[in-house]
Amino acid sequence: MAIAESFRLEDGFSVYAGVRATRDAVVEDAAFAVAKLGGADGTDAAEKIVAALIRPDVSIIMLDGCIVSFYNWIDGEALYAKFQKPVACYVFEEPEGRVEEAVRKLFPDWPDRLRAIEKLGSPTPYYTKAGYKIYVRSWGIDPIYAGKAAELAMKLGKMPEPLRVARIMAAGARALLNTLGLRLVNGH
């Protein structure tokens, strides 16, 4: 299973898309949710998607980042505790080191937000056989095995195919909402 998001700051919300895929990355089902930009509901949005897609044969929940939606976040540990499936959060670019500075500057609730983000832990670098470097946080699975799981699902470049498809679907859903002129109230 894979969850990714798409947002534009002017929208005020982020669209999350999730896919359930087979081991060879064939997509079987999809689900969507929304979260507020700069909100604290990223984990809730991810939980809705997992609840809609979960089956006993799901072996891992892949996340396209944990710090999402303009400093919202997805708590991988909470997903692991709730669904009892390994969770891996991947970052495909060098993580930026200014999260703390930005959070302090932008959010009145910065102490709580920073605690939640710091609880995610530091990512572990993983090097693929093709020479890509990805960063992994994981719960219920060793980060190296989570990196191997990502590598096994890579078809085009360094992103696992289910995450790539989920990202495309999230962007498409966001574009559809904008094309239809739909505005979400309070991020929902």
From Swiss-Prot:
Superkingdom of source: Archaea
Alphabetized InterPro entries for the sequence: Endo_dU
PANTHER family found in the cross-reference section: UPF0215 PROTEIN MJ1150
Family per record: Belongs to the UPF0215 family.
Protein name per its UniProtKB record: UPF0215 protein Pars_0148
Organism listed in the record: Pyrobaculum arsenaticum (strain DSM 13514 / JCM 11321 / PZ6)
